[in-house]
UniProtKB/Swiss-Prot annotation:
GO terms for molecular function: L-ascorbate 6-phosphate lactonase activity; manganese ion binding. SUPFAM superfamilies: Metallo-hydrolase/oxidoreductase. This is Probable L-ascorbate-6-phosphate lactonase UlaG. HAMAP family: UlaG. The keyword Hydrolase applies. Its cofactor is a divalent metal cation. Probably catalyzes the hydrolysis of L-ascorbate-6-P into 3-keto-L-gulonate-6-P. Is essential for L-ascorbate utilization under anaerobic conditions. The gene is ulaG.
Amino acid sequence: MSKVQSITRESWILSTFPEWGSWLNEEIEQEQVAPGTFAMWWLGCTGIWLKSEGGTNVCVDFWCGTGKQSHGNPLMKTGHQMQRMAGVKKLQPNLRTTPFVLDPFAIRQIDAVLATHDHNDHIDVNVAAAVMQNCADNVPFIGPQTCVDLWVGWGVPKERCIVVKPGDVVKVKDIEIHALDAFDRTALITLPADQKAAGVLPDGMDVRAVNYLFKTPGGNLYHSGDSHYSNYYAKHGNEHQIDVALGSYGENPRGITDKMTSADILRMAESLNTKVVIPFHHDIWSNFQADPQEIRVLWEMKKDRLKYGFKPFIWQVGGKFTWPLDKDNFEYHYPRGFDDCFTIEPDLPFKSFL
């Protein structure tokens, strides 16, 4: 059989997916986090891998799914939260635009799996399956009640799950995880299709969503999940020391308010008294595409007048950020390589060839 006859769609997918293979898995495993620091990697959407100086590994909102893949059904799912929000009927054209940079089935060293809320792009059955199959049998799954309900429904033993609500603290080796109030109003209208939201007082946010503060020996990270802007960020900033804050940013389509704007991101950072603010979530959905440079431009306009005590950082999916080593950087660039140029003799026809 010739090569072109032996290749199938399935063999093509297996040979190219996930796009980064186990490259990032290996990088994270090999990373030695220096004392007085923490390292984290952006996994796409609001997915984060955090590693402490003690070698503790936790992942938050790691999602391995996709968005729309076909024009087959031109209508939005009845009762979808975006339909409730804006009274729309047409299919939302939210295609995933970010590659898969971490292979869940290549994860071996992990100390906790966390989710901020139960929306499909923040909690993943494949991650749960991979951790259950390949990692230690005592790795906890930590999240609000709705997330735990999902994990248990997928087959994660109930005793492996920890339900958290605002005010709860969970210790995972040298990382202290504080569950804080979430401000994700979209979560409150994510309801069964036959349930009406109009004229009904929503149930509590605390069972649906939480924000997290990760206190490590080398610094503190605030993860806001899908939270919108809230005045309560200032309360969190009053009560906790926050070094780096992550906020869900995006260009909201007409009639929709689901992501923070550039102004919201700056207000969040100011309220939290953070040192660095990093936007995320803008990478993932084609119809929420946004330019994070807008945040930096607005920051430049306001920073001297308002005396901002923070800086924005523009990240790339799969990239690493180390606190405090990267605190004065404004943008991430992937490693460029070729740092060992001319360690061996070039093989060129003549010296001035290039």
